Amino acid sequence: MILLDSTVVIDYTRGKDPKLHLLFSSLKLGVCGIVRSEVLTGWRTAADRAKLIAILNGLTQVSTPDSVWDTVGDNLAELRRHGLTVPVPDAVIATLGMNLNIEVWSRDPHFAAMQRILPTLKLFQEPP
């Protein structure tokens, strides 16, 4: 399974990248609660919200164990010690991926920067 960041889900919902449609239909993909929350901030109409919920419900739902939250804080502190400040949701997604030993798929450059400091973070390499 690959854990998705909201950047990928949002790009998929916009429907402008045919490659994403193919990848979403062929890969086992999951989202965690924080990604659901981020994605659901973007709806404008009830129909938009229903479409987003349907897309999110079609993905594997990955829960965040209580034990991960302390590690999120530790990882944020480690990143800051190296001069990198990232949004808390990105640190949650990265830490959850590391905890589950699965790849994270993001289009946000924060993740590559985090990986240089947190080498156990595995990032999905999007095909060209």
PLM features: what roles do these ranges have?
Residues 1, 16, 94, 98-128:
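Acidic, PIN/NYN-like endoribonuclease modules and their adjacent C-terminal/linker elements
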Residues 28, 60, 120-122:
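Conserved beta-strand segments of alpha/beta enzyme cores
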Residues 12, 60-107:
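Active-site neighborhoods of divalent-metal-dependent phosphate/nucleic-acid chemistry enzymes
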Residues 46-50, 79-80, 121-125:
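Short, hinge-like loop/turn segments at secondary-structure boundaries
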Residues 4-7, 32, 85-87, 108, ...:
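Histidine- and aromatic-rich ligand-binding microenvironments
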